[in-house]
């Protein structure tokens, strides 16, 4: 009974516009009673309506994972290869341009580009010139396209190999034509989790520092969480708390850029390396867990990060559509191709036609609208 009263009080506070404390967030995630979960869902849906409106947005974009050759060995990753391995690939400029050309022809406003950390991706012994060449290859041909490219991990990789400051790398990428930074490589922003999941990746403080630097330098970022593996409810809320604090800094300090959206990425373990797969004990995400976490994320972050999305690649289109009544206001993008999650064994597919996304949204009786990367309306 006490818990029921506690949940009601927490949800009441959220509906009054207050930010939840970490303890309150954990209480919501711990709920298992259908009645409590239904109340959390309803609150997240009301807050979504208040903070983001009823319009469901989507983006026409293409994903380009330009190489899967990677120096790191994250315990969840089925995408990476060593150079010379079966299935290793590294796209050249012509192949990247071909994909970009196809994307523009199909109406894309955004190209999302990320890849493995390939130490050979250099020009004259330096990494940054290689990355700048990739950017310039696309921007010279298609100056109008928005490049959403290179995660905080890739920024650290370039800076480390070339002996540069993170800010120098971000400025160079920005000036070459990168329009925003994916908030990936966050996984869970908890160093205890990271030691098991991705011990070679940047630590929590470095990820937060690089993203905050991007905001200071006028580069908007997204934010993500890889959920449903070894992390606890406390660690999930700790992650959301760090993102909220990061966004509060960007807004309160008057930085020229900030976090544009929060994307939940439920863990897909089907093809993941065996030790983690065994530990997690399942191959596909549990939809009910992802929906509850997404609803709590809306309640926890929504005052500061109003745009929320769940991944149809990971949850399937039906799951991502259902998430639209669990706090989400965006259904994501067309992608056109996607390798990282698909190689992990996801069943959601890699390409979604605009009409399919529209039909899914319309099935809920909600209006839809094409947007760009920064959530500005696109007249389609």
UniProtKB/Swiss-Prot annotation:
It holds the Pfam family Radical_SAM. Pathway: Cofactor biosynthesis; coenzyme F0 biosynthesis. One of its GO terms (molecular function) is 4 iron, 4 sulfur cluster binding. Its EC number is 2.5.1.147. Keywords: 4Fe-4S, Iron, Iron-sulfur, Metal-binding, S-adenosyl-L-methionine, Transferase. It catalyses: 5-amino-6-(D-ribitylamino)uracil + L-tyrosine + S-adenosyl-L-methionine = 5-amino-5-(4-hydroxybenzyl)-6-(D-ribitylimino)-5,6-dihydrouracil + 2-iminoacetate + 5'-deoxyadenosine + L-methionine + H(+). The keyword Manganese does not apply. The keyword Iron applies. [4Fe-4S] cluster binds at residues 70, 74, 77. Its cofactor is [4Fe-4S] cluster. Binds 1 [4Fe-4S] cluster. The cluster is coordinated with 3 cysteines and an exchangeable S-adenosyl-L-methionine. Consists of two subunits, CofG and CofH. Belongs to the radical SAM superfamily. CofH family. Catalyzes the radical-mediated synthesis of 5-amino-5-(4-hydroxybenzyl)-6-(D-ribitylimino)-5,6-dihydrouracil from 5-amino-6-(D-ribitylamino)uracil and L-tyrosine. PANTHER family: FO SYNTHASE (COFH), LIPOYL SYNTHASE 2. This is 5-amino-6-(D-ribitylamino)uracil--L-tyrosine 4-hydroxyphenyl transferase.
